UniProtKB/Swiss-Prot annotation:
Localization (cell): Cytoplasm
Gene3D superfamilies: PRC-barrel domain, RimM
Highest classification ranks of the organism: Bacteria, Bacillati, Bacillota, Bacilli, Lactobacillales
Comment text on domains: The PRC barrel domain binds ribosomal protein uS19.
Main location (coarse class): cytoplasm
Role played: An accessory protein needed during the final step in the assembly of 30S ribosomal subunit, possibly for assembly of the head region. Essential for efficient processing of 16S rRNA. May be needed both before and after RbfA during the maturation of 16S rRNA. It has affinity for free ribosomal 30S subunits but not for 70S ribosomes.
Protein name: Ribosome maturation factor RimM
GO MF annotations, alphabetized: ribosome binding
Amino acid sequence: MNYFNVGKIVNTQGLQGEMRVLSVTDFAEERFKKGAKLALFDDKDQFAMEVEIASHRKAKNFDIIKFKGMYHINDIEKYKGFSLKIAEENLTDLEDGEFYYHEIIGLDVYENDILIGQIKEILQPGANDVWVVKRKGKKDLLLPYIPPVVLNIDIPNNRVDVELLEGLDDEN
């Protein structure tokens, strides 16, 4: 079964079994809602156990969650540093034109039918995502995910068509 990261437990919060989670999902309200089922993976990325969310709230830069059946700091302290993941079967369908990161990473990038490289990572620096494109013999290309640049995403054919605006590729 495939699992996808939604957050990392970075610390405990108080004495009542709450944990601070650094979220890496665009769907935190859905992923951490009461009753949601997630999987815990240890610091070696080994499956540890399935958990159910008992409560969730936002606080500053963190999501504060509590697991069902774990209501004291002693129950959860051992999970600091663990990752929270969602099973692929529990992913929700997205609207047309929306994609999960795992669908984008690995796609081939083309400009005018010429292969530029392959998407290896997605950064979230601010207003829009930035795709990191690995290229042969050149340094990585940082490609903003904006309509004038990304023209077409074709998941079944493992392809993204782009138009590199002036200044995006400083090696040409």
